[in-house]
Amino acid sequence: MFTVIVNLKNYAEANGKNFVEFVSKLPKYDSVRLIIAPAILDLHNAHEFRNVEFFSQHVDDVGYGPYTGHIAIESLMNYGIIGSLLNHSERRLGEDKIISTVKKAQMLGFEIALCVESMEEAKRYSALKPSFIAYEPKELIGGNVSVSTAKPEIISEIVDICGTEGVPVLVGAGIKNRQDVRKSLDLGAQGILVSSGVVKSPDPVRSLNSLIK
């Protein structure tokens, strides 16, 4: 199934009361798996939306205990959160932390969309078999040039690399229209990771529909 993760980041347009309004307007798609990644303080509202799947934007490899400021998988699961982004370009981690967090998540049945910025990282981390590898070149994030246009050959190679491990690939950075999505799918990607193109749009639902329908 085609997967779309919408990362709300800390954008004011989808924060606090705006988050509730944003999610309330989302349509249900029969052939698309839609996942929303809200700001951490909005995750407690996830239980109000039983028909929406939620990821955290980050998670740590700790459990319950004396871990000030950390985000435990167990705590997220108690709120109905089913997975998390990990190693996003705005929240990068070291290799040891990535490995330990992915392994802990797998033990608990918690999904991880592991973000990578290069083919080398895709090679290194696909062997961990996260739920998804999300390829986002840092220099294209938030821009108007899509990754499918700027780096099509790298997407194809990452799809091949991850395919040998059975890991689906999402692509992000600069995805703004249906043509960008179609190019990504033609290159073998199984979904997209989007943010500002939807969240900061004057009509987020229309923008989302333009990518999906």
Curated annotation (Swiss-Prot):
Domain of life: Archaea
Subcellular location(s) per record: Cytoplasm
Entry protein name: Triosephosphate isomerase
InterPro entries per record: Aldolase_TIM (IPR013785), TIM_sf (IPR035990), Triosephosphate_isomerase (IPR000652), Triosephosphate_isomerase_arc (IPR022891)
A biological-process GO annotation: gluconeogenesis
Active site: H88 (electrophile), E136 (proton acceptor)
Keyword Lipid biosynthesis: no
GO MF entry, a single one: triose-phosphate isomerase activity
Broadest EC class assigned to this enzyme: isomerase
Main location: cytoplasm
Assembly and oligomerization: Homotetramer; dimer of dimers.
Species annotation: Thermoplasma volcanium (strain ATCC 51530 / DSM 4299 / JCM 9571 / NBRC 15438 / GSS1)
Keyword Isomerase attached: yes
Pathway, per record: Carbohydrate biosynthesis; gluconeogenesis; Carbohydrate degradation; glycolysis; D-glyceraldehyde 3-phosphate from glycerone phosphate: step 1/1
Enzyme Commission (EC) number: 5.3.1.1
Family label: Belongs to the triosephosphate isomerase family.
Residues annotated for substrate binding in this entry: N7, L8, K9, I141, G174
Annotated keywords: Cytoplasm, Gluconeogenesis, Glycolysis, Isomerase
